[in-house]
UniProtKB/Swiss-Prot annotation:
Region (Disordered) location: 214-239
Protein name, as recorded: Small ribosomal subunit protein uS3
Residue ranges constituting the KH type-2 domain according to the UniProt record: 39-107
Keyword terms: Ribonucleoprotein, Ribosomal protein, RNA-binding, rRNA-binding
Amino acid sequence: MGQKVNPIGLRLGINRTWDSRWFAGKNEYGKLLHEDMAIRAALMKTLKQAAVSKIIIERPHKKCRVTIHSARPGVVIGKKGADIDKIRKLVAKMTDSEVLINIVEVRKPEIDATLVADSIAQQLERRVAFRRAMKRAVQSAMRLGAEGIRINCSGRLGGAEIARLEWYREGRVPLHTLRADVDYGTATAHTAYGACGIKVWIFKGEILEHDPMAQDKKMAEQDHGGGGGDRRRRDRDAA
């Protein structure tokens, strides 16, 4: 099942958290959920050139805090903050709450799965060869510290008559390991021949903070100087 399910959804509550962080009663829940979906769709459409990775929505008391993670924060903010005021007004039309906008810069867009997928989609729309686009993305991600990456491209690649799926993988991408930090992103390239789907998995290493077995092992290694040498020495002294 790890091969089929969305890796982010599988890890929610383990090493990932939700993009919508609020609580509502059953009367309000549906309304707020639809608000979130409308806000995200509008912002993604408005900020198409800003390389938006994700949008986090939090709702403290009578407020709506929207945090935009972008690789190009300057495009979001605009000259002297003009564009951010437009975004605030756009979001304010969709919700009754007071709107707060935060911008967070994505430092390494090459290892953000959503941004990698969007980049490949844009290249396919510009008629760049799909193999070259995939290979370039894989090399950039591995160079910037990813432990593994897998990219799937499916559709009428290169204008072929029959749709097919092509994929590249480098390093390891453990989809079943729940403590693995696996980022996942998708995008659609609307080419002259039809739509092509892009899926990207990026493995950034294992998160061991919440793993009691890993913590016990780490403590044992610190106590014994990082190996079994001390134990062997004690056994020899006792003999």
